[in-house]
Amino acid sequence: MGFTVNHIDSTLAPYAEKSYQHYLADAKEYGITDAERYAQDKTLKEIKQGVQSYTYELAQTQNALGQTPFTTISFGLDTSKWGREITRAILEDRMSPDNRDVFPKLVFMYRGEINGDPESPNYDLYKLSLECSSKKLYPDYLSFSADDIKGEHYRRDVYERSGQTIAPMGCRAHLSPFINPETGKDVTDGRFNIGAISLNPVKFALESKDINGDFDQEKFDALVEKYSNMVFDILNWRYERVGNLYGSSNPLFWCEGGAWQRIKTTQQVKESNLLDGATASIGYTGLYEMVNAMKGDNWQNVSDDERHQLQAEFLSHVNRIREERSKADKHPYALYSTPAESLVFTWEKLLTKQYGVISGVTDRDYLTNSFHQPVWIHSSAIDKIDYEKEFHQLAKGGHISYAEFNYGVAPTSLEAIVNYAMRQGMYFGVNVINSVCDDCGQHGDFLMTCDHCGSENILVVERVCGYLTYSKRSGVQAVNDGKWSEIKERVRHGVKRGQLGSASYAESH
């Protein structure tokens, strides 16, 4: 998880207008010819420099472990003059060949009549965004349209009801809809998540065998109940713990406008409604391996439909427990698809140590992330979207899907795929390998050595989970062994329905 500045275009646009009026007044005072053009040029320059300074300051801010703050900005729906120019400046800054930033994460908010349709006012910015994604991976795309979802879709429904946008916190965490009881209005900004704990359904499946080694569904369901309730007991304690904090523990957040409601430094959080708008999340990972563990030696014969059904049944079961505990504890719990940057490696090693190497379960260096189609499966991007779209609706507290493409994939191809994902109401990202050679300056799709000069002194930007990171710095691996194995096994997805993807990096090099 991380920190998000939602609708940054709309947030900053009024200040750009103030700058414009300031420069316009100066131009008129000093008799500058074409005062409007002067004021506009100065304001555009200020916007550009502001974006550059903002990203630079974030990159230079690090904790004792050398970590950069996990930050996200969302934009794309503001059709005002300055809102559009702020969006344009963000995209053009990230597209610069010299820009190697991975933070802030960029999220383009999609709504057909605003930026997705060719005749929409911000369509040019959507096209620019796709061009940026084709080489720099970001922005990701967040749907506020969901045209193919006929039932409830909470982001779209909140937006259509109130005009408010729900943006992800960090890479994928989402807050549930919340209405301020005092005003009756939706609250989407100034809210927060107080923690996430993950389940290990692969272990549950391995533990759910009878004396003959056959899978026992009742035992599995009992383990899901037991450990889910254990998680909610801990999260309930977490709410109590946060509720006992005083405003003075973090005055910038609790007292000075960071949160959606303010308290005094001498007040406890529980004396307000602040926690009514907070969530705590139950996560999970490894659904692909969970099904394989259920099926034992027959796992290779499981159809996609059966696998999909078993994964959906698990999530539905956890959701039922979540709803019961939310009602009993009076807290807004959420089901969250854990990013598991290191957990997929750690859990695989622990499972292997306890159960040995099991075909389809512990025979790789990692578990498959959350509900995702495994990275080594050859399919089209559209087919992958179809496989994963239901899980976005089941795990509303955190989700993202992405597809793999070649560096510099044609924006027109991306547009068709992103449009399809947006019609399904998804949160969707574009994956390419974005590498830079520190010796010759070559940009491209290479993971081990520069494809121009052969140097190993390369910087590789990859999506490790929802965030981008440097998987290699100066030619040295910078992620855990499990994630590195997964990155090398990723296949490129076809751009048309039914079109199989190209070979993985390991197969093609």
Which residues make up each language-model segment?
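Conserved catalytic cores of very large enzyme subunits
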Residues: 1-276, 297, 304-308, 312-460, ...
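Short intrinsically disordered, low-complexity coil segments enriched in acidic
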Residues: 1-5, 284, 311, 335, ...
